[in-house]
Amino acid sequence: MKRKSDSEQQPSVQCRKKKRIEELGLNLSSTSDDDTQYSNHGTQESSTSSTSSDSDNEEKRPVFGSGRNETLPDTLAEGSSSHYSMYNSVSQKLMAKMGFREGEGLGKFGQGRKEIVETSKQKGRRGLGMVLKGFEKELNINWRSEPEATAYEEVDWFPECTTDIPDSDELSDWMIVGKRKLIIDDETEFCRDNLLTSLLQCKSAFDELEGEEMRRARTRSNPYEMIRGVFFLNRAAMKMANIDHVFDYMFTNPKDSQGKPKLKDKESELLYFADVCAGPGGFSEYVLWRKKWHAKGFGMTLKGPNDFKLEDFYAAPSELFEPYYGEGGVDGDGDVTRPENITAFRNFILDNTDHKGVHFMMADGGFSVEGQENIQEILSKQLLLCQFLVGLHVIRTGGHFICKTFDLFTPFSVGLIYLLYCCFERVCLFKPLTSRPANSERYVVCRGLKEGIDDVRNYLFNVNRRLNHLRNSDQDVTLVVPLEVLRGDKQFNEYMVRSNESCCEVQIKALAKIHAFVQDSTLSESRQADIRRECLKLWGVPDQARVAPTNTDARTKFFQLIQSQNIEVFGYKPTPLTAKTLEKLIHVFDYRCMVCGSEPKFLLGLGRSQIYTWGGRSNERWTRLDLKTELPRDTLLSVEIVHELKGEGKAQRKISAIHVLDVLFLNGTDVRTQHFTQRIQLAEKFVRAVAKPSRPDMNPIRVKEVYRLEDIEKIFLRLDMKHIKSSGGYLRLSYTGRDDRHFVPCGLYIVKTINEPWSMAYSKSQKRKYFYNSKTKNSQFELPVESIAPFHTCYYERLFWEWGEGVQIHDSQRRDPDSDKLSKDAVLQFIQAHHPCMPSSLTEDR
């Protein structure tokens, strides 16, 4: 029997081995170390076949090794045309030595993986192999064409409204009720269809994306992201800082039509503002940081986890902010959609702003619309209306308004903007660079509330009532201004369309940019740190970290404030007013006087309810004030704790109040060198700022009523004999203050406000007071700076007229003939003798 040759036998063996491998079901995408070594042998045979078809196939792939067809092109050779040519020559040679040919795997039978192992596409914490459908594809939007990031912004105002404010007759037919609508796709009246469609598609692309992955990409892609909140409570504070600067500080430093500031820190008027739907309070923290105790804020927001967090105001004195939650006051719910809350909030503000209203109102309302982001505008329509409505209720004529909005595609939203456009002198839709470009957030900024807006306010009030009535039905208010009116005002309509489309384009590019940053984690914005520095410098905000205020004991803080001043002056007792010392009052115009109710002491505020008192002597300790009140940190006052009374008999009520005699530091501001009259004026301003009329449980703070010595008779007119509960039924001398509360006086403080050698006199020819220098014989009408008596001079040279037993102050009292104490008549006679004839209506402050 003839034996087969080796060449005939070997192919059949190889075929059997290959068949065996396939029967075992081996994974052909990988090879074992042994297989690799075996396939790399130089004696490896090619798998060519004698058939023509096999030969044709063989010619289409590269062959490596001594046993392969050497005439075939080497597609891994350097410079050859192949998608493997991207690899360097070393890699190609290594693969060639292992016998690799394009289109075939490694291994003896080419059973190895044929494709290159792809780089990992794992994204964040996604599950292995997870692919988000619809997100991996390209958006085909050129986001790289966005303008270069800059700290400078421009304001584009609506054209000035030339039509009259609509009246009640015209408004009566404007509200339209229709079927409730929960889609936004067809709202193309104020935006091109293709832009709206692209925007919604871009938003929808993120529906399946994990929130954390989205946030990381957003953080890397936004050139302004590093601005964050700086040292404030949150990012909202920096948005307000951004907007305030861009609009020339019209909120924190309002100006008149000539560009002059309406308010000055040295004057008595406060800057009143309201913060609505704005918990935890970032907007207010910024305003109070900028203005300190020269501003007073009122706030209303929904109670709950997003309430005002005043304890977290690290940068500003939260004691100057008073939350009020509508009906029920501090016990209300703060729901801005309830008409009762709107009315109560309005009344509260008018009662505490001399019935004028606030200088400006901020509103930053919003709520979670997770899963329904595309119709956020529709879901928040009533919130937007109510914020506008509260603004028209509480802002004074000439005041300003700022409110957050979202998309403004629906005629309902645009109608609300139109009503503001009619009610304010100028209106602007503005997106600050601190607002992330990928969201639909914008702010409507309104300057100068006009007179005669009552009909619009009442109309919106009725619209809100209707919305509440339709809340659980399939009906809704679809229009507040007819479409023909919105279309008819061409300037308004063109601005509205231009603003919407511009915001759409910015948002689409920003979303596409985030999409790209999600897909490529190596992308980042390189100028974030530089942009942050530029913006903070431009806005006047220090580049500092947020740090909680340090706690300091009262004694240490006191010495930090007064620094090198002699502490002995705080222990000086007033000079008793007697027949001998009465001659000190010869220059009557130099003195002011106040009714005393108890022993004076110094009061130091360390923030919130941390308040301490001290008697003034070096051997005394600072003790915690046992009263319920709040003061900003770094506040040092000269005060009395007085038991005030209201009513008489059994219904008489007593409350302990803080009466301010003089001020040294107000929230860190040193006022000791100011004129006494100026210090008292600033004290009254400060007390109005920290007052909490909504908190009857707190002990009040009041400033003593100050009288000129020549007007001392006005004090006696406010003295009366009253029944005091603790006096055993006897009548006691009582002094009634401005708020109809009375207390038992113990004497009169007389304070010298002019430094020697200066004194005040009266010119009969000019019929006005003037200042006279006894050394230089110089006289002038303007107040000489060197004549101002600072705090320590006033405190050291003050006199005290005691109203004790035997002193006749009231006509019903009896004078002790053996007493050497001064009576009312004796003091009045002295003052009248040294008081030049002067019109009683003359009321100079100094």
Swiss-Prot record:
Chain span(s) of sequence motif Bipartite nuclear localization signal: 2-20
Compositionally skewed regions (Polar residues) per UniProt: 27-45
Domain WW: 752-786
EC number: 2.1.1.57
UniProt keyword Cell division present: no
Gene3D superfamilies: 2.20.70.10, 3.40.50.12760, DNA ligase/mRNA capping enzyme
Active site: K239, D364, K404 (proton acceptor)
Record-annotated G-patch domain positions: 87-133
UniProt-annotated stretches for the region Disordered: 1-81
Binding sites annotated in the UniProt record for S-adenosyl-L-methionine: N234, C277, A278, G279, P280, G281, G282, F283, D335, V336
Transmembrane segments: none
Keyword line: Methyltransferase, mRNA capping, mRNA processing, Nucleus, S-adenosyl-L-methionine, Transferase
Superkingdom assignment: Eukaryota
Coiled-coil annotated spans: none
Statement: the UniProt record of this protein carries the keyword Kinase: no
List of residues binding substrate: K203, S204, A205, F206, D207, R218, N374, I375, Q376, N439
Catalytic activity: a 5'-end (N(7)-methyl 5'-triphosphoguanosine)-ribonucleoside in mRNA + S-adenosyl-L-methionine = a 5'-end (N(7)-methyl 5'-triphosphoguanosine)-(2'-O-methyl-ribonucleoside) in mRNA + S-adenosyl-L-homocysteine + H(+)
GO BP terms in the entry: 7-methylguanosine mRNA capping; methylation; mRNA processing
Domain RrmJ-type SAM-dependent 2'-O-MTase positions: 231-450
Broad EC category: transferase
GO MF term (any one): nucleic acid binding
Subcellular compartments: Nucleus
A cellular-component GO term for this protein: nucleus
InterPro entries attached to this UniProt entry: G_patch_dom (IPR000467), mRNA_Cap_2O-Ribose_MeTrfase (IPR050851), RNA_MeTrfase_FtsJ_dom (IPR002877), RrmJ-type_MeTrfase (IPR025816), SAM-dependent_MTases_sf (IPR029063), WW_dom (IPR001202), WW_dom_sf (IPR036020)
Function: S-adenosyl-L-methionine-dependent methyltransferase that mediates mRNA cap1 2'-O-ribose methylation to the 5'-cap structure of mRNAs. Methylates the ribose of the first nucleotide of a m(7)GpppG-capped mRNA and small nuclear RNA (snRNA) to produce m(7)GpppRm (cap1). Displays a preference for cap0 transcripts. Cap1 modification is linked to higher levels of translation. May be involved in the interferon response pathway.
The protein, known as: Cap-specific mRNA (nucleoside-2'-O-)-methyltransferase 1
The organism of origin for this protein: Xenopus laevis
